[in-house]
Design a protein with these regions (language model features):
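Transmembrane alpha-helical segments in integral membrane proteins
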Residues: 53-58, 124-134, 209-230
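Hydrophobic, lipid-facing residues on alpha-helical transmembrane segments of integral membrane proteins
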Residues: 86-97, 154-170, 174, 210, ...
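Membrane-embedded alpha-helical segments of multi-pass membrane proteins
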Residues: 45, 119-123, 206, 256-264
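Membrane-interface helix/loop boundary segments of multi-pass membrane proteins
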Residues: 148-154, 215-240, 270-274
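N-terminal, membrane-interfacial amphipathic/helix-forming hydrophobic leader that caps
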Residues: 1-141, 147-148, 290-301
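Functionally important transmembrane alpha-helices
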Residues: 231, 235-301
Length: 301
């Protein structure tokens, strides 16, 4: 869940990347307009550093020999027609779910919705894992689960997320400038902000920090991106998987920032060769978002 307060629709009808945009998200909380030349200069340097880091990653990925490292070796030579068919069915399911969410925006989000969403997405992941194992794949090897140490995974994810924020905030700012600063929040954000019991908040925290990052990164980056890259190349794979990721949250004001976030996750996975790096970034992003919602004074200008 790119926690930007997603609508109750797809994989988290909780939702929102990894409170929503408007007044209830980390972007709104941390994206205040600089009030001085010094802060403006710092923001500009931060953005330039972010662009440099991700352009460098893209350049390094492009300079590699295909099928020799990380996600290339794991998916390009392996995923075939059966996986493409399964991915197509998953994408169709996503579109149907998004359509249902958009057509019924007034559905009240609740703990029952959250639990049902968890069970549904968990079943989808289990089906895909079972299918891949039946086909003879080693999922842990494909995802690079043991490629990096725990410390290396955590530090890499934290650094790449740090440099992703200026890109996300820029997309958020541009969206607000073009379409106006909407006040709507994603359902999970409203649910979290309005929850009155520690049990409800703990349930949302567990889902957003531990469950959603694993499920979404497995589906969007490991599987869908892997299949798309196999047939259409890295660029279209990153682009289309990020579009699906943003659309799956069914919250239009958050679409552009979530698209950028999904692209950063895919680049991190492709560069590191480990889906755990993308999962770490996603989990940290959602953790910061919930922290901003719970303690807005920390992130206020």
């Amino acid at each position: 869940m790119g926690l930007r307060g997603k609508r109750a629709g797809v994989f988290h009808q909780p939702g929102k990347d990894k409170g929503r945009m408007g007044s209830g998200s980390l972007f709104a909380a941390s994206g205040a307009v600089p009030s001085s030349i010094l802060s403006l200069l710092f923001s500009l340097l931060y953005l330039l550093a972010s662009l440099y880091v991700y352009i460098s990653l893209i350049y390094q990925i492009g300079a590699r020999t295909p099928d020799t490292f990380g996600a290339d070796a794991a998916t390009t030579r392996r995923f075939g027609l059966p996986e493409a068919i399964l991915a197509s069915l998953l994408i169709l399911f996503l579109f149907l779910t998004i359509g249902a969410s958009v057509s019924q925006p007034s559905i009240q989000f609740s703990a029952r919705n959250l639990l049902a969403n968890f069970l549904l997405t968990g079943c989808v992941v289990l089906v895909i894992i079972t299918f891949l194992q039946f086909r003879g794949f080693d999922v842990s090897w494909l995802g690079g689960f043991f490629r990096l140490s725990f410390i290396r995974t955590l530090s890499t994810g934290a650094v790449l997320l740090f440099f992703a924020y200026p890109l996300i905030l820029s997309a958020d700012t541009i969206t607000q400038q073009l379409f106006g600063g909407g006040s709507s929040k994603q359902n999970i954000v409203e649910f979290f902000s309005g929850s009155r019991t520690i049990q409800q908040r703990m349930m949302i925290i567990v889902f957003a920090v531990a469950i959603a990052p694993v499920v979404e990164e497995f589906l969007f980056r490991f599987f869908i991106y892997g299949v798309l890259k196999r047939y259409f190349g890295r660029l279209l794979g990153v682009t289309f998987s990020a579009l699906l990721f943003a659309a799956a949250h069914a919250h239009l004001p958050s679409f552009a920032p979530l698209f950028v976030l999904g692209g950063c996750f895919a680049i991190a996975y492709e560069w590191s060769g480990s889906i755990l790096v993308a999962m770490t970034m996603h989990s940290l992003f959602n953790s910061l978002t919930l922290t901003a919602l719970a303690f807005p004074e920390i992130f206020s200008p």
